[in-house]
Amino acid sequence: METLTVKKVNEVYMTIDCDGGSCFELSDYFTFTVPGMQFMPAVRNKFWDGKIRLFNAQTKKIYSGLLPHVQKFCDERDYKLEIDPAYADEEFSLSEAGRFTNTLDLPFEIRDYQLDAFAHAIKKKRALMLSPTASGKSLIIYLLAAYLNKKTLIVVPTISLVQQMAGDFKSYGYQGDPHMITAGVEKETDNPITVSTWQSIHKMPKKWFEQFDVVIGDEAHLFKSKSLTSIMTKLIGTPYRYGFTGTLDGTLTHRLVLEGLFGSVEKVTTTDELIKKGITELPCIGDGRQSGTSGSPSILNASPESATGGGLAWLKTGDTIVIDLNNY
């Protein structure tokens, strides 16, 4: 039986010790074609083949977050995998999570799935949390930041979400104001919590990112792949890495890249389960300007302009529609 050995390089990459044959297999296994690549100038001009290779057969490096996929690769081929002890889970139980949250003066009771997600994230140290609209993911983010109590960078896609996240933290009991970075705002701070748009920091030097022990990406599916990769690969010393997204459909970054940069997907809950539990903030049709985490969550966003003359043109305010959650 062939043995592959995983060794930690830093918080971004690991190496896989393999021979020529298995290295070729790994390279093929972790190679995918970028959707729409045939329309890209680099491909049309034959500067690039339109494929992304997550395993570098020369350096034998791959994103650390893809370790479970490497394990699956080995299981499918009856290869033995030896894993660096540095990737062992932390000891953190659900009861410990509950005891910690009881010490917080929160304005409402934590839902069971929020506690489960919090415990899972601390135990694994990295995860891509699939958390739909109205599931209260900003509270999970707050719990992570409060428990870890380390220099934390929270990255969001829009200015409105920077302000909303900071406001949510205040409402949960955070003392002081998180440092909010948008275009033109000072990026240096002693504040333990920094909330920024990815557009404001993706060109910052690697040295600037060395200060952070925790990185959390909210609405991760909306980040442009090149910018997200630029940010996350500069955080080579950041051990706690969490991505939050409401969907993995239509992401601007390939799912395997998201998992590689953050960690394995963990389903927090589903919209169907939220409604069955009687969550009052029921989904609605939005006008395309909602953040997706507001008090009036939308299961479908459609701008008035795009709806004019289209399939939604016959809908008017107050109309009732039926959504089949089995197909959502």
Protein language model regions, located:
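Walker A/P-loop
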Residues: 123-148
